Regions:
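N-terminal export signals
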Residues: 1-19
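Bacterial lipoprotein signal-peptidase II cleavage site
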Residues: 18-29
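Early extracytoplasmic/lumenal segment of secretory-pathway proteins
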Residues: 37-112
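A structural signal for short loop-to-beta-strand junctions that line the ligand-binding cleft
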Residues: 98-105, 120-161, 186-188
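Short beta-strand->loop
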Residues: 120-131, 149, 268-281, 290-293
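Ligand-binding pocket segment of bilobal, Venus flytrap-like solute-binding proteins
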Residues: 189-193, 197, 201, 208-276
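Conserved C-terminal helix/tail region of periplasmic/extracytoplasmic solute-binding proteins
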Residues: 241, 346-378
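Mature extracytoplasmic/periplasmic domains
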Residues: 285, 290-350
Length: 378
C-alpha cells in the first residue's frame, strides 16, 4: 500500500500509513464558556439525493447520518479505511473517478493531497456554521485560511488495558512495553499505522518521533521488529471494543476508540485508560471535499450540519473526541457524558503531546511496520 502512494505522488512526496498525526492544534483548555453559535444548518443549495463518504470506521453516530437524511434528503453511503495511506492510495488510483464526496484526512496530509489535485478548495461562505469553531482549531499551519479543510476533531494516543491481565499500573510507554513483553505477551494489539507503531519507541525514550536521523531509525527498527513485534497479537486501529470483549489484554489506542470500549462494557472498572509519557501523539482529523465531487451541495450541507453545536455534541458523545466547537466542553459536562477525562485533556497532558510530520523518514517507517508485521507473534 505504501509503495503505491509513494509512486503515485510526484516529486518524491512520502506518505506513511499513519493513523492520525498533525502539526498544530489548540491547547488542553477551551478558554470559552457557554456560547452555542448557530443552531440551524443552512442549506448550501438544492442537495443531491446521495452523499458518499470514505471515512474512518465507527467515527460518527449512525443516528446523525439518519438525522441528516431525514432533514435534508440525501442518503449516505460510507466506505471505511484504516489509515490515511489507504485512503490516499484509493483516491490516487481512481484518478478523479472515486465517486466519493467527503474524505477525512489527518492534518499533515492535506498539503500534499491539495497540491496533487485530490481536494476541492472550500467556499467557506457555504459553511456558515464554520463560525462555531473555536479559533484554536482553525487556520492550522498545514491549511492556512482553511482553504481545503475544516476541523472534525482532535485527540491523542495511549492504551487501554484489562487489569485482570496486567495488574501493575501502566503509567508510561516504558510500562506499556514491559507489560507487552510480560503478562500481556501474545495478547496485545498495536495501531495498524507505521508512525503510531514506531512512535512507541520514540515516545518511550523522549525522542522526536519525526526524526530523519538514520541511527535513531535503526534503533527504532531493532526495538520494534526484534523486541516488540514477537509479543503482538494483532495490528488493529480500532481495538477498544475488541479489548473489552476479551480479544486483547492490552491495546495501543486512540482516546475516543478506547472510550468506546469502556462505554460498551458492563464493567468498565475492569479496564484502565492511559496517555503515554514522557511523550505521545497529537493529531487532528478534518472534513474535506474530494476534487470534483459527484454531490457537492450535499457535501457542503453535511459539513455545515455537523458543525451545528447540538449535532456536534451528539457526535462527541458517540466518538469521544474534542470537536473544537465553542462551548462543547461545558455542554458535555452539563449533559453528564461519561469518561470526559478521555475527551478533554489538561494543559499538563497537552504539554506532552507531539505532532507528526510527513518527511523523508516515512518510507523507512513503513518498511519497519512491514517487517514488524512479518515478525509478529499473532
Amino acid at each position: 500500500m505504501a509503495g503505491s502512494v509513494v509512486a503515485a505522488f510526484s516529486g518524491g512526496i512520502l506518505l506513511s500509513a499513519c493513523g492520525k498525526s498533525n502539526n498544530t492544534v489548540g491547547g488542553g483548555t477551551t478558554g470559552t464558556t457557554g456560547a452555542t453559535g448557530t443552531t440551524g444548518a443552512t442549506s448550501p443549495g438544492p442537495m443531491e439525493d446521495t452523499l458518499n463518504f470514505y471515512h474512518w470506521a465507527a467515527y460518527d453516530d449512525p443516528k446523525i447520518f439518519k438525522k441528516f437524511t431525514d432533514q435534508y434528503g440525501p442518503s449516505t453511503k460510507i466506505d471505511v479505511y484504516a489509515s490515511n495511506e489507504e485512503m490516499i492510495a484509493k483516491l490516487v488510483a481512481a484518478g478523479g473517478t472515486s465517486g466519493y464526496d467527503i474524505v477525512v484526512p489527518t492534518g499533515v496530509y492535506i498539503p500534499q493531497m491539495a497540491a496533487n489535485g485530490l481536494l476541492e478548495e472550500l467556499d467557506l461562505a457555504r459553511i456558515p456554521n464554520f463560525k462555531n469553531l473555536q479559533t484554536a482549531y482553525t487556520n492550522q499551519a498545514w491549511d492556512p485560511g482553511n482553504k481545503h479543510s475544516v476541523c472534525k476533531d482532535w485527540g491523542s494516543t495511549g492504551w487501554i488495558v484489562d487489569k485482570t491481565v496486567v495488574s501493575t499500573p501502566i503509567k508510561t510507554w516504558n510500562d506499556f512495553i514491559a507489560a507487552a513483553k510480560g503478562p500481556a505477551s501474545g495478547n496485545i494489539s498495536v495501531l495498524d499505522a507505521p508512525t503510531d507503531l514506531t512512535g512507541i519507541y520514540f515516545w518511550a525514550n523522549g525522542l522526536d518521533w519525526t526524526t530523519t536521523d538514520p541511527a535513531q531509525l535503526d534503533a527504532c527498527e531493532k526495538f520494534t521488529v526484534n523486541d516488540l513485534a514477537p509479543h503482538v497479537k494483532a495490528f488493529d486501529s480500532y481495538p477498544g471494543i475488541a479489548l473489552t470483549q476479551g480479544n486483547y489484554g492490552l491495546s495501543q489506542a486512540w482516546n475516543g476508540d478506547a472510550r468506546q470500549g469502556l462505554l460498551a462494557t458492563k464493567d468498565p472498572s475492569r479496564y484502565a485508560w492511559g496517555l503515554g509519557t514522557p511523550l505521545t501523539e497529537l493529531w487532528m482529523d478534518n472534513w474535506t471535499i474530494v476534487k470534483n465531487p459527484p454531490h457537492p451541495n450535499a457535501a457542503y450541507g453535511w459539513i455545515n450540519f455537523i458543525l451545528d453545536p447540538t449535532i456536534s455534541l451528539q457526535d462527541l458523545e458517540f466518538h469521544g473526541y474534542n470537536t473544537g466547537i465553542t462551548g462543547v466542553k461545558e455542554a458535555a459536562q452539563a449533559a453528564n457524558f461519561k469518561f470526559l477525562d478521555m475527551v478533554f485533556f489538561s494543559d499538563a497532558q497537552v504539554a506532552t503531546f507531539r505532532a507528526g510530520a510527513v518527511n523523508s523518514a516515512n518510507q523507512r517507517l513503513v518498511d519497519i511496520w512491514n517487517k514488524a508485521k512479518a515478525a509478529a507473534g499473532g
